[in-house]
Amino acid sequence: MAKFDAHLKCSFCGKSQDQVRKLIAGPGVYICDECIDLCNEILDEELLDNQANTNNSPQVKKKLTNDNPKKSVPLELTSIPKPLEIKSFLDNQVVGQESAKKILSVAVYNHYKRLAWKVKEESKNSNSTDSQATKLQKSNILLIGPTGSGKTLLAQTLAEFLDVPFAVADATTLTEAGYVGEDVENILLRLLQKSEMNVELAQKGIIYIDEIDKIARKSENPSITRDVSGEGVQQALLKMLEGTIANVPPQGGRKHPYHDCIQIDTSQILFICGGAFIGLEDIVQKRMGKHSIGFTTNSDQNNVDTKKLVEPRDSLKNLELDDLVKYGLIPEFIGRIPVCAVLDRLTKETLESILTQPRDALVKQFKTLLSMDNVELKFEPDSVEAIANEAYKRKTGARALRSIIEELMLDVMYTLPSEKNVKEFTITKKMVDNLFSSKIVKLPSGSKRIIKESA
């Protein structure tokens, strides 16, 4: 240890404590703030040189330049998946919703075709001042459907197939700038985080804004008071949906004038907005059936036809712009989401198919879970139907299926891991009907297991 000196000096540049702002002591050495700054500059230069020399390596291409095909959207027209291919992949993951899947497949194909066209035109005109090429505008997507109908799943599956960054945002947490809540730019931060803060990759991603119906303004007529979580949020989202250079705080939260922000171009990001829009069908029915309200002289047959015309399940197929305006969305907001897909309410048959058909079906998931305990799980066909019927009664769509099976399997998954003699377990309709009153009977080693069910 060096002898203490009343006039401490930097061990690197020799300047005394009085000549520098800060002198940091270590075990027998001292370093001043100026030498620290110099060291940082040297390290930064070395880091930049290393990046420049290694950018051609496969590892760096994968993370920084997005040349890895599984980490970037192919921007060659011949490489973009065709609508039939996109829908085929959706069919493997999502049961039903044929019309919505077709609309989404075409919209997504056109979106990434537009990006490929933009890259092609930019490279063609990089050395030319001629800008006569047609500019293709972006078409965002609006998904309307009851809870549990598959809105989020469709968006997630699209992003999985295209292998692009995907982020989900909740519209109910957003507020107008200057009020307590999240700024709309925080939506972009989630996408950046999914892209490992890679701006170029994030700009090819998909953002799903859930509960978009919850930011409808509270009344059809503009109010004199500010609606900071309704119409105010719609106004704040306009430029982002249309395409702008947004400033995103890297740490989230509110933007600060003295903090650096990340700039991201939203014109290449596909926005998919989804909501249940409870009550929208009533608005459509009122518009369509307004001439048949009250007593009429029409025949009974005509009255039956009118009832069919305004059937709640089919009324949203006749959705018009004015209906969304009456619901509470401002015309400017609707104009920036030109593609609209209406999802059907799930039927009992569809719920039954959801249990068994998709790649990640719930039945397959629980079979995999029990296989880890060396137990083969089986479902009788009648039990699957009974589970679907119970889910249909709960009116929460496909979400009810997992809740029911979790309740059904609770005692089974609690007991089976400790049962060495059980190699097979079968879920029966009676177990579902009797609210999961089955019991496992422990048998001697080597004997088959049976299930006792209460009457």
Swiss-Prot record:
One of its GO terms (molecular function) is ATP hydrolysis activity. ATP binds at residues 146-153. Residues 1-51 form the ClpX-type ZB domain. GO terms for cellular component: HslUV protease complex. Residues 52-74 are annotated as: Disordered. Zn(2+) binds at residues 10, 13, 32, 35. One of its GO terms (biological process) is cell division. It holds the Pfam family zf-C4_ClpX. Transmembrane segments: none annotated. Component of the ClpX-ClpP complex. Forms a hexameric ring that, in the presence of ATP, binds to fourteen ClpP subunits assembled into a disk-like structure with a central cavity, resembling the structure of eukaryotic proteasomes. Belongs to the ClpX chaperone family. This is ATP-dependent Clp protease ATP-binding subunit ClpX. It comes from Prochlorococcus marinus (strain MIT 9312). The gene is clpX.
